[in-house]
Design a protein with these regions (language model features):
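Hydrophobic alpha-helical segments
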Residues: 1-139
Length: 139
């Protein structure tokens, strides 16, 4: 998938093998987006810590909300790989396949709670036009 050389899971050793093992334990597999860091294990470790903190850390957002935000940000960034990656995770929480497809293709047409719509509107705006976000958008 990537143009960047990656270390295969079955041939990995040392620090990268340990990180791949961690990923398989914690996530069940090693995603392609993380394999692209395999030439720099320290970058992979930092990316993994950030990813786990954002999507699985404590806080006021549910896993479904975090994955919806990730899908919307991925769509705004026009990254089909990222949309697909986060859609797969979101499908574990959104069982209505029509709703799932609406969120992934154009969340603005999906029947969402006011709170979820506000989260996604904010994420989309922050991604598309970060300089346009003002203090009153946050508080």
């Amino acid at each position: 998938m990537s143009w960047i050389h990656v270390h295969a899971e079955d041939g990995a050793d040392g620090e990268i093998a340990e990180l791949y093992d961690r990923l398989r334990r914690e996530r069940g597999r090693v995603s392609n987006i993380l394999k692209v860091h395999s030439l720099r294990p320290s970058a992979l470790a930092h990316h993994l810590d950030l990813y786990m903190g954002l999507l699985f850390g404590s806080g006021g957002l549910s896993r479904a909300q975090r994955e919806m935000i990730a899908v919307v940000v991925s769509r705004e960034n026009d990254c089909e790989y990222c949309v697909s990656h986060h859609r797969e995770a979101l499908a574990k929480y959104v069982k209505d396949t029509d709703l799932l497809e609406q969120i992934c293709s154009n969340y603005r047409q999906a029947e969402l709670s006011a709170g979820d719509r506000a989260l996604l509107d904010y994420a989309a705006r922050l991604t598309a036009s970060p300089a346009a976000v003002a203090e009153n958008d946050v508080v």
